[in-house]
Curated annotation (Swiss-Prot):
Protein name: Chorismate synthase
Required co-factors: FMNH2
InterPro entries noted in UniProt: Chorismate_synth (IPR000453), Chorismate_synth_AroC_sf (IPR035904), Chorismate_synthase_CS (IPR020541)
Classification via PROSITE patterns: CHORISMATE_SYNTHASE_1, CHORISMATE_SYNTHASE_2, CHORISMATE_SYNTHASE_3
UniProtKB keywords: Amino-acid biosynthesis, Aromatic amino acid biosynthesis, FAD, Flavoprotein, FMN, Lyase, NADP
Binding-site residues, NADP(+): 47
EC number, UniProt record: 4.2.3.5
Cofactor note: Reduced FMN (FMNH(2)).
Length: 362
């Protein structure tokens, strides 16, 4: 229950952080799409641990293996299974957590729900679960590019009180990947890196905001009323580990405007297309894409597992303290960028197929 996502382009992820491996089964991918392990690996390398001095030191190659659904570099239209083997586990680092709950982590709630949990690495609550999402997202991105020319670019917008000034209309993947913190603001990125390093030395952690833009999204995607495009985007992004907030377009800032200030005025461009002069709606109106760029923001809390000693209780309710061992990100934001991109791609891909199925007959 709860490990599958999507309707026509549907994924199911599997595996635990310290188990044999993690992965995904993708059902509904159209046949004859050219895809390679190298294309999937590119996205996984952006997500993998140990990639820089500001991420977890856990060393995993995260090498993907396509088990089914692809032959001679083309999809068959049958389920695609992708697996990544776990290699660098240190389960002994979690011995104290057999009985002591990590504050603000899923330990206590998993115990409350299931009466059992995978202590080492956090099991399914670990961010290693997102390997399957990112792998599936690589295929969804390729499909969106091939069918509609959609481009998806995510980046770190904010860490703590440091906020980058980035234009979602023009930002490129190359700019994002030019810095280990994945903030393409050249003035702010070094400050973010210094802040993450400093807080890591203290045994603490930081949160922030990832912004993501999807360009050239076709009009008409979204299924009112309960499957509005922004509703599905919110669900997708909020299902990622450590997420605590979602905005689209002007978001909460729109509450400070009047209707005349917030409304996006229509006009007809030189190609005869109906466009909007501003994009405070963030690319959707009435739950349906309007052809403008879709711009979302996702808030991530500070990493829950930290080395600083904290008050907590045991699974029997006794007061204790916990200074967590293990290898954890002092800030999840740099590695969260490809995760957000993947979830946006999965939603858009699913809705594109749904739109084709329902509304392209005549």
């Amino acid at each position: 229950m709860g490990s599958s996502f999507g309707h026509l382009f549907r994924i199911s992820t599997f595996g635990e952080s310290h188990g044999g491996g993690v992965g995904v089964v993708i059902d509904g991918c159209p046949p004859r799409l050219e895809i390679s392990e190298a294309e999937i690996q590119f996205e996984l390398d952006r997500r993998r641990p140990g990639q820089s001095k500001i991420t977890t030191p856990r060393k995993e190659a995260d090498q993907c293996e396509i088990l089914s659904g692809v032959v001679d570099g083309k999809t068959l239209g049958t389920p695609i299974a992708i697996v990544v083997r776990n290699k660098d586990q240190r389960s002994q680092d979690y011995s104290e957590m057999q009985v002591a709950y990590r504050p603000s982590h899923a330990d206590a709630t998993y115990d409350a729900k299931y009466g059992i949990r995978a202590v080492a690495g956090g099991g399914r609550s670990s961010a290693r679960e997102t390997i399957g999402r990112v792998a599936a997202g690589a295929i969804a991105k390729k499909l969106l590019r091939e069918i509609a020319g959609v481009e998806i670019v995510g980046y770190v917008k904010r860490i703590k009180d440091l906020e980058g000034q980035i234009d979602p209309e023009t930002v490129t993947l190359e700019q994002v990947e030019s810095t280990i913190v994945r903030c393409p603001d050249e003035a702010i990125a070094p400050q973010m890196i210094d802040l993450i390093e400093a807080i890591g030395r203290e045994g603490d952690s930081l949160g922030g905001v990832v912004e993501c833009v999807a360009r050239r999204v076709p009009r008409g995607l979204g299924e009112p009323v309960f499957d509005k495009l922004e509703a599905d985007l919110a669900k997708a992004c909020m299902s990622l580990p450590a997420t605590k907030g979602f905005e689209i377009g002007s978001g909460f800032a729109g509450t400070e405007m009047t209707g005349s200030e917030h409304n996006d005025a229509f006009y007809t461009d030189e190609q005869g297309q109906i466009r909007t002069r501003t994009n405070r709606s963030g690319g959707t109106q009435g739950g349906i894409s309007n052809g403008e760029n879709i711009v979302i923001r996702v808030a991530f809390k500070p990493t829950a597992t930290i080395r600083k000693e904290q008050e907590t209780v045991t699974n029997s309710g006794e007061a204790t303290t916990l200074a967590a061992r293990g290898r954890h990100d002092p800030c999840v934001l740099p590695r969260a960028v490809p995760m957000v991109e993947a979830m946006v791609a999965l939603v858009l891909c699913d809705h594109l197929l749904r739109q084709q199925a329902q509304c392209s007959w005549w």
